[in-house]
Amino acid sequence: NLLCLPTDNFPTFADEFENREITLNKVRFLKLLNKTRISISNDDTRHYLNGVFLHITEANGQNFLTGVATDSHRLSSSSLEINNAEEFKSLILPRKTVFQLSTLLTEIQGELLMQTSENKIKFSLGNAKLISKVIDGKFPDYKKVVPTSNDKSLVVSSKEFISSIERVASVSLDRKEGVKLSIAKDHVQVSVKSANSGEGNEKINAKLNSEN
């Protein structure tokens, strides 16, 4: 015989969701999560940074669902077009939920529906549902740290840039030893110098646009 708890003790969330469901592009939403979750903070003393901040932004008359995450050292942001934006209120999606949802989006086919309540969010995908509490806290005004009047832009091949950084960074096993980028008009010098394991250097083609 097994001792069991009363079924009435099991929490139910279905009655809490009164807002209309919002249909999301599953592939684009997965990309949004993957692009932002890398910057989620692990510092539990600032719990409001332990997730992805989802909110509505507007550009050229179009509404976007924008996700932002930061650990105060780096910041990641990604957006996708959204309808029924008036049904969505800003919230912080917890780290664990972000990773669980990413797995669901990878493994299950079907239409992705999102619905929110006062302090919870629900995702429906195929025959699966994921309901999560959201983080109770205020996400910092990240727009204050994003440059708006920068006259400099650097264009590189993303594939070549990532490969170069991975090769050069492999020289050092110490995370505290950063990769140095030296920027010129037609190239970028990628280098790392380690007191214990040596140094690495690579040069990749680039185009620097600058008024100065």
Regions found by a protein language model. Give the residues of each.
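Structural preference for solvent-exposed beta-strand-turn elements
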Residues: N1-N212
